[in-house]
């Protein structure tokens, strides 16, 4: 249906068997985002997993203030959510926060509650999207395992939550 596609995940074996090729174009990292008033500036991969599993529920458990953690997720089919599910491996994410949205004739639809910069909030997004495209004000990225998500640390692979971004083409298509 198209000549070129983009993906934040590698091709599955069955997709390759259908004649698709993948070429790495760039790398991006999943940035962990918190409210700028949050005193936590670094989280371990283990603690991020525990937060999103629901085992750590208060910032004081990771060196912050005595405040409930509000862990936001991305919609199920988004690239950053797919990356987070991959990162979590066999550990399932806890049920996401949801909002009920009213859409005229469709009635009420439940949607995943995406990051809102409120006290206690934590979220994640591709670093480039957060810092380069949206330039969200009033939120801060934090380090993971002591490494801040810079272009250099992502490109070198030093930052621990990195994914290649792929160009997908059809074999033999010039």
What residues fall within each predicted segment?
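Exported/periplasmic ABC-transporter solute-binding proteins
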Residues: 1-174
